[in-house]
């Protein structure tokens, strides 16, 4: 949980986003997002997916499974 909290806040600030901007990008209420960053609330799978897309990273990076910030390349359709 600590890994996700730290990475969420660091990436958000690195991108120059406020919690209000994250609300607009993800649909997660600002107060709920704040609690997630403080470790008082967990991200659902769908919320994690939306946050990763908004921050242009992978869910694996947020979870601490990789140190590669770049998202995985999308498959060609």
Predicted regions and their residues:
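DNA major-groove recognition helix of helix-turn-helix
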Residues: 37, 47, 66
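Residue-level signal for the short linker/turn that defines the boundary of a DNA-recognition helix
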Residues: 6, 16-17, 43-46
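Short, charged recognition helix plus adjacent turn
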Residues: 14, 53, 63-77
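Residues within the helices of the helix-turn-helix
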Residues: 9, 20, 49
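DNA major-groove recognition helix of helix-turn-helix/homeodomain DNA-binding modules
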Residues: 27, 46-61
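The alpha-helix within a helix-turn-helix
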Residues: 12, 23, 52
């Amino acid at each position: 949980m600590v890994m996700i909290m730290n990475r969420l806040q660091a990436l958000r600030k690195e991108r120059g986003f406020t919690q209000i901007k994250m609300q607009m990008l993800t649909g997660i209420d600002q107060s709920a997002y704040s609690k997630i960053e403080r470790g008082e609330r967990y991200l659902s799978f769908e919320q994690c997916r939306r946050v990763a897309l908004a921050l242009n990273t992978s869910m694996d990076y947020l979870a601490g499974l990789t140190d590669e910030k770049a998202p995985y390349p999308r498959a060609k359709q």
